[in-house]
Structures are given as structure tokens and as C-alpha cells.
Curated annotation (Swiss-Prot):
Signal peptide: none annotated. Gene3D superfamilies: Leucine Dehydrogenase, chain A, domain 1 (3.40.50.10860), NAD(P)-binding Rossmann-like Domain (3.40.50.720). One of its GO terms (molecular function) is methenyltetrahydrofolate cyclohydrolase activity. It comes from Ruminiclostridium cellulolyticum (strain ATCC 35319 / DSM 5812 / JCM 6584 / H10) (Clostridium cellulolyticum). InterPro entries: Aminoacid_DH-like_N_sf, NAD(P)-bd_dom_sf, THF_DH/CycHdrlase, THF_DH/CycHdrlase_cat_dom, THF_DH/CycHdrlase_CS, THF_DH/CycHdrlase_NAD-bd_dom. Catalyzes the oxidation of 5,10-methylenetetrahydrofolate to 5,10-methenyltetrahydrofolate and then the hydrolysis of 5,10-methenyltetrahydrofolate to 10-formyltetrahydrofolate. The keyword Oxidoreductase applies. GO terms for biological process: L-histidine biosynthetic process; methionine biosynthetic process; purine nucleotide biosynthetic process; tetrahydrofolate interconversion. NADP(+) binds at residues 165-167, 190, 231. This is Bifunctional protein FolD.
Length: 284
């Protein structure tokens, strides 16, 4: 393997250490940050993610409020809880763990969160501010990808960046953040013609489609940087990404692994957004 493996775990620890120092300073002034996490139903993957987030909060001194609601929770009950948290001064950030049950309107739930407590940066107002280049918060996974690139000395400005995937959570905001860093950005999706050729034009290739090992070596230009955001389970039940890691690592100059890559950075950016929310709400 010739590619450098970009270590998200190490960088996330560094980010969180910096945040802990800032949060300790806030606490010395009587300001105690709090993040509310709502999970509806008992999806095992969601439960793992929520536990990770709770541990991150504990690590850096943010109080974690967890609301584990049954699958049968009505939309009205969930919206009522969000309204209560919107009006709770001890809660600075609110996160609803997705996915939520199909009988609840996801868009309505996201829009119900107060924009200044929107730790995930999913609220339409925050997405709009992101689009015009004046964000209060940054979407967690895309921001984590950019920080991982920059902290490893990987140039973005003037580079051809290809994003595979057009979701509202990763693909679209990822393209916006790369564009803000002066990259030339192309988005690929299921209807893209000659997707292999387009991917091969990338200096930086970010893949977020949730298709197990979709990106093969022939999709990658020698020396390209490959960021694998996707996570799924292979036939053997093991976690795999959207990229054929071992094979692509022989061609790329830098690459992320499924574990210890983008995931820890996503959570570190959630902590950063929660800290920003505290500053925003306290006029700091």
C-alpha cells in the first residue's frame, strides 16, 4: 500500500482537546453547554452513534441530554419535545438522530428545531446561509472532510474535486464547502454518464453513496486523494466503505479507512457546532 492513511481519530482528538479548553473557559464564567440528542425507535446503528456522541460530550465537558423515545412516538409528541427543548436555556444544541420512523415527517421535524440550536446544520435557514457563504454552523460530515484534508496539508484551492453522491446530508453540502475553498467541483450520481471517467478526473474524490466497494482502482487517477464517507455491511457482516480500500490504496496518494476516518471527524464537528451555538446564544 502506497497511500497515506488519513487518521480521523487522531485529528478528532486534537479538535476535541481544543474545544475542551474553550468549554472549560466558558464554565469558569458560569456558562454550561448542553446538547440534547433525540432517538426515536431502537435502530442498533443509531444507538451506537448516539452512545459515541454522548461519550464525546462527556470527554469535552458538554452536558448530554438523551431522549430515547419508542417507535410508536407520534409526530406531534416529537414536535412537542423539540419545542420544549427550543425553550430550555440549558440546552444549546438539539440533534434528532436519523432515520426516524416513516410515520413522522422528517422535514417537519428538522424545521421545528430552532435554527440557533441546529447542531447538525440541517435546518432550511442554516442550509440557505451555507449556500450564500454566510453559515452560522457547518454540516458535520462535509466540514469534517474539509478539516481532514486541510490538516493533512492537502491543497483544495484550484483542484478538481469530484463528489459521488447528492444527498442533503453529505453530497450537496460537501460540494458547497469545497467550492467555498476554491475547488472546481463536479457532483456524480446514479444518472451520471461515464461516471468512471469523471471520477478519474479528480484530484480529490469524495464518495458518499452507501454502495459497498463501488469505487474500484480504475475510477481513481494515480496520486489522487480518496475520501470514503460511505459505511455499509458486506456479505460477511463486516463494515465496508464505498471504496475498494486495499486496491485503491495502491494508486491513491492518500485515503481514509472506514473506521477511524471520516466518522470521528463528523462527531468532532458536531461538538464544534454545539460550542458555536453556545457563543451565538450568549452573544459571545
Amino acid at each position: 500500500m502506497s497511500a497515506k492513511v488519513l487518521n480521523g481519530t487522531e485529528l478528532a482528538a486534537k479538535v476535541k482537546a481544543g474545544l475542551k479548553a474553550k468549554i472549560d473557559e466558558l464554565k469558569s464564567k458560569g456558562i454550561n453547554p448542553g446538547l440534547a440528542v433525540i432517538i426515536v425507535g431502537d435502530d442498533p446503528a443509531s444507538r451506537v452513534y448516539v452512545n459515541h456522541k454522548k461519550n464525546d460530550c462527556t470527554e469535552i465537558g458538554i452536558k448530554s441530554f438523551e431522549y430515547a423515545l419508542p417507535e410508536s412516538t407520534s409526530e406531534e409528541e416529537l414536535l412537542d419535545l423539540i419545542e420544549t427543548l427550543n425553550n430550555d436555556a440549558s440546552v444549546n444544541g438539539i440533534l434528532v438522530q436519523l432515520p426516524i420512523p416513516k410515520h413522522i415527517n422528517e422535514e417537519k421535524v428538522i424545521a421545528a428545531i430552532s435554527p440557533d440550536k441546529d447542531a447538525d446544520c440541517f435546518h432550511p435557514m442554516n442550509v440557505g446561509k451555507l449556500m450564500i457563504g454566510k453559515p452560522e454552523f457547518l454540516p458535520c460530515t462535509p466540514a469534517g472532510v474539509v478539516e481532514l484534508l486541510e490538516e493533512n496539508g492537502i491543497e483544495i484551492s484550484g483542484k478538481n474535486c469530484v463528489v459521488v453522491g447528492r444527498s442533503n446530508i453529505v453530497g450537496k453540502p460537501q460540494a458547497i464547502l469545497l467550492l467555498a475553498k476554491n475547488a472546481t467541483v463536479t457532483i456524480c450520481h446514479s444518472k451520471t454518464a461515464n461516471i468512471e471517467e469523471v471520477c478519474r478526473s479528480a484530484d480529490v474524490l469524495v464518495v458518499a453513496i452507501g454502495k459497498s466497494e463501488f469505487i474500484k482502482p480504475e475510477f481513481v487517477k494515480p496520486g489522487a486523494v480518496v475520501i470514503d464517507v460511505g459505511v455499509s455491511r458486506g456479505a460477511d457482516g463486516k463494515l465496508v466503505g464505498d471504496v475498494q480500500f486495499a486496491e485503491v490504496a495502491e494508486i491513491a496518494s492518500a485515503i481514509t479507512k472506514v473506521t477511524g476516518g471520516v466518522g470521528p471527524m463528523t462527531r468532532a464537528m458536531l461538538m464544534k457546532n454545539t460550542y458555536k451555538a453556545v457563543l451565538l446564544q450568549n452573544g459571545l
